[in-house]
């Protein structure tokens, strides 16, 4: 079994929209993920999130408040077949863009990432977002409406 993995995620909201990675899982539909990824040995969460945003957005961010902690125990969810031995703990932080998003400066897009997109918060539930439960954790103005620990949700 794999060790438990720490992952950091960016919540970037501006003008009633949230910035998410646009992804193609080869299933015929567009999906969206929060920018971020795994913490490396010797990195703080803040350092990891700044690195991940540079890799995936080509942008520098400032990292603010920790607002959610989510567990993902793969065997409990829809991707159990491929993620059965995965246990990841994700830490979601409010972030602000310090530079503009520029994918030509992105250094390491995720394999399934085909771009980024600003999605209207008032229509967030209309999109395929992973984890979908996170769309339920904020209102249409981006205000956090859930406790910090959201559990093993997808």
Predicted regions and their residues:
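Active-site-adjacent beta-strand/loop module that shapes the phosphate/pyrophosphate-binding cleft
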Residues: 74-104, 137
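Internal catalytic or translocation cores that form aromatic/hydrophobic pockets or channels
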Residues: 46, 50-51, 71-72, 88-89, ...
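N-terminal strand-loop-strand
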Residues: 1-34, 61
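The catalytic Nudix box helix
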Residues: 34-35, 39-68, 78
């Amino acid at each position: 079994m794999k060790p438990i993995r720490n992952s950091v995620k960016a919540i970037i909201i501006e003008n009633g929209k949230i910035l998410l990675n646009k992804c193609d899982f080869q299933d015929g539909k567009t999906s969206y993920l929060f920018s971020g990824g795994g913490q490396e040995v010797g990195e703080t969460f803040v350092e990891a999130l700044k690195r991940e945003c540079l890799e995936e957005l080509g942008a520098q961010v400032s990292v603010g408040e920790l607002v959610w902690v989510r567990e993902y125990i793969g065997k409990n969810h829809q991707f159990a077949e491929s993620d059965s031995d995965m246990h990841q703990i994700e830490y979601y932080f409010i972030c602000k863009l310090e530079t503009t998003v520029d994918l030509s400066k992105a250094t390491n897009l995720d394999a399934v990432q085909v771009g980024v997109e600003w999605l209207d918060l008032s229509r967030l539930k209309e999109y395929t977002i992973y984890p979908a439960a996170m769309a339920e954790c904020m209102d249409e103005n981006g205000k956090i409406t859930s406790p910090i620990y959201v559990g093993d949700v997808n």
